[in-house]
Amino acid sequence: QEAAPTEESFLLDKAVRCAVCDKVFKTKMIKRGRLKRLEADMDLRPRYEHIDTLKYSVISCPYCGYTAITRYFEHLSSMQVKMIKEKICVNFKPADNVEPTLVDYDTAIERYKLALFNTIGKKGKNSEKAYTCLNLAWLLRGKRESLDAKDPKMAEQIKECREQEEAFYAQAVSETPLPLPT
């Protein structure tokens, strides 16, 4: 019987150039070819066997603090670069630690929150804010599902995850009003 693949076997290191400070750094990316998609949740949260890909869908520059969901990371106007330098980079304190081999839920949640902060700081589109909030809600659900519900010590953390998930989900919906029929 074959052992289940590890989370690490789905990852690769990729060199990325920061759109703000122009420095190159390595980050973890998903090997898409190895993924086996499971049925999505009712709200279309993507689910895969053996790995939560959402944990690796944010890129964070360790030098200047610019952080965004992968699909938005490289697409910045010169005005947005200026706003990020003024609002994010000046307050950013680089961490001494290197990129972790595996990203845990708490680290991923912090990165998504930083991505949301960057999106607000660069005056990103409401759709980008909404997508970030939706991903954050999904990530919080993933964390909640990974906790042992039978452990009484986890009850408070599970409750907190559920409350934060609902708050970010509500924010995602409020950021993108549905088009009204004409």
List PLM regions with ranges.
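Short metal-coordination and nucleic-acid-contact micro-motifs, chiefly zinc-binding Cys/His arrays
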Residues: 12-14, 57
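Cys/His-rich metal-chelating microdomains
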Residues: 24, 67, 179
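Short cysteine-rich clusters marking metal-coordination/redox-active sites
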Residues: 18-21, 61-64
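Short cysteine/histidine-rich metal-coordination sites, predominantly Zn2+-binding motifs
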Residues: 33-43, 76-87
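Short recognition patches in nucleic-acid-associated and regulatory proteins
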Residues: 23-51
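Helix-turn-helix repeat elements of alpha-solenoid scaffolds
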Residues: 101-114, 158-170
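Amphipathic alpha-helical repeat scaffolds of TPR domains
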Residues: 87-96, 106-114, 124-151, 174
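Conserved small/polar residues in nucleotide/adenosyl-binding loops
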Residues: 176-182
